[in-house]
């Protein structure tokens, strides 16, 4: 599933061409993705101006004129791309993409040219909703999200407070979107490896006031922010379905230290990386380095 770095990469790719553009028409390739499209979705979008694009956690937000915002989630396999006539011919040979195009929006950019914004989703686990812009962050999907690991916003002190009485594992606590918003399986595994912390360790062990616990929490917070920053710089991680808006791939997956490396040697100690299952998700870690 695309995580914060992948969604932020998409936002940065779409923003230059979409900001200030006018929606000409919208066609839907199906009645629903994970959820049904909003009622009269095509008609409600036609003629609107896209004021700006933002992101909250793993949600991409299209702010429109008339005080409505499209809340988009990529699900497991969703992707956005922008086409003009030349790119349309190119993608016509990429059957997988064309076969699962479920949302096609024609728009006029500020340069006067006509483009198409296309949402593709083979598994249809993504979704699009319309929300009141003035009350956007009161929406049930957004109102309980925690801090984002951007620009060192997440600190050791913040994590310690969040982990008080948390009997769950560190892995589960970090996947809790009310604590750190936008983190997913990949980057939690990588941040824990960098911090020498086992995904099975209880979160509350970092919540004490001891100097050791404070240092561990501080280190973890810094590594979370660092790994997210590096992943954004690399254009995210391309695993299975995730691509940039032009169809190109991110390359942070080539920097993985543990994720997806079961049986391979840890680059620090030489011990083999192991995979365990926690709450139905794979966790990768080094049993020698991470305690």
Swiss-Prot record:
Keywords: DNA damage, DNA repair, DNA-binding, Glycosidase, Hydrolase, Lyase, Metal-binding, Multifunctional enzyme, Zinc, Zinc-finger
Protein task: Involved in base excision repair of DNA damaged by oxidation or by mutagenic agents. Acts as a DNA glycosylase that recognizes and removes damaged bases. Has a preference for oxidized purines, such as 7,8-dihydro-8-oxoguanine (8-oxoG). Has AP (apurinic/apyrimidinic) lyase activity and introduces nicks in the DNA strand. Cleaves the DNA backbone by beta-delta elimination to generate a single-strand break at the site of the removed base with both 3'- and 5'-phosphates.
ZnF bounds (FPG-type): 257-291
UniProt-listed Pfam families: Fapy_DNA_glyco, H2TH, zf-FPG_IleRS
Cofactor(s) required for function per UniProt: Zn(2+)
Source organism of this protein record: Bartonella bacilliformis (strain ATCC 35685 / KC583 / Herrer 020/F12,63)
Family: Belongs to the FPG family.
GO terms classed as biological process: base-excision repair
Reactions catalysed, as given in the entry: Hydrolysis of DNA containing ring-opened 7-methylguanine residues, releasing 2,6-diamino-4-hydroxy-5-(N-methyl)formamidopyrimidine; 2'-deoxyribonucleotide-(2'-deoxyribose 5'-phosphate)-2'-deoxyribonucleotide-DNA = a 3'-end 2'-deoxyribonucleotide-(2,3-dehydro-2,3-deoxyribose 5'-phosphate)-DNA + a 5'-end 5'-phospho-2'-deoxyribonucleoside-DNA + H(+)
Gene3D superfamilies attached to this UniProt entry: 1.10.8.50, MutM-like, N-terminal
Protein name from the UniProt record: Formamidopyrimidine-DNA glycosylase
CDD domains named in the record: EcFpg-like_N (cd08966)
PROSITE patterns, per the entry: FPG_CAT (PS51068), ZF_FPG_1 (PS01242), ZF_FPG_2 (PS51066)
Alphabetized InterPro entries for the sequence: DNA_glyclase/AP_lyase_DNA-bd, DNA_glyclase_Znf_dom_DNA_BS, Formamido-pyr_DNA_Glyclase, FPG_cat, MutM-like_N-ter, Ribosomal_uS13-like_H2TH, Znf_DNA_glyclase/AP_lyase, Znf_FPG/IleRS
């Amino acid at each position: 599933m695309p995580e914060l770095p992948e969604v932020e990469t998409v936002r940065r790719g779409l923003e230059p061409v979409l900001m200030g553009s006018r929606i000409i028409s919208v066609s839907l390739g199906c009645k629903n993705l994970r959820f049904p499209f909003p009622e009269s979705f095509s008609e409600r979008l036609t003629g609107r101006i896209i004021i700006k694009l933002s992101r909250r956690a793993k949600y991409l937000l299209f702010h429109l004129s008339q005080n409505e915002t499209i809340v988009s989630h990529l699900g497991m396999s969703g992707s956005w791309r922008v086409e003009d006539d030349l790119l349309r011919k190119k993608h016509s040979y990429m059957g997988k993409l064309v076969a699962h195009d479920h949302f096609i929006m024609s728009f006029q950019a500020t340069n006067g040219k006509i483009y198409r914004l296309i949402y593709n989703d083979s598994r249809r686990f993504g979704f699009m909703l319309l929300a009141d812009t003035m009350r956007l962050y009161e929406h049930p999907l957004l109102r309980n999200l925690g801090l984002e690991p951007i620009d060192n916003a997440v600190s050791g002190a913040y994590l310690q407070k969040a982990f008080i009485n948390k009997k769950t594992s560190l892995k589960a606590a970090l996947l809790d979107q009310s604590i750190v918003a936008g983190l997913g399986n990949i980057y939690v595994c990588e941040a824990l490896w960098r911090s020498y912390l086992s995904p099975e360790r209880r979160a509350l062990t970092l919540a004490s006031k001891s100097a050791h616990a404070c240092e561990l929490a501080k280190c973890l917070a810094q590594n979370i922010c660092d790994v997210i920053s590096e992943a954004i710089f690399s254009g995210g991680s391309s695993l299975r379905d995730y691509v940039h808006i032009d169809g190109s791939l991110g390359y942070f997956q080539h920097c993985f230290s543990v994720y997806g490396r079961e049986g391979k040697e840890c680059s620090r100690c030489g011990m083999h990386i192991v995979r365990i299952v926690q709450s139905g998700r794979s966790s990768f870690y080094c049993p020698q380095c991470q305690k």
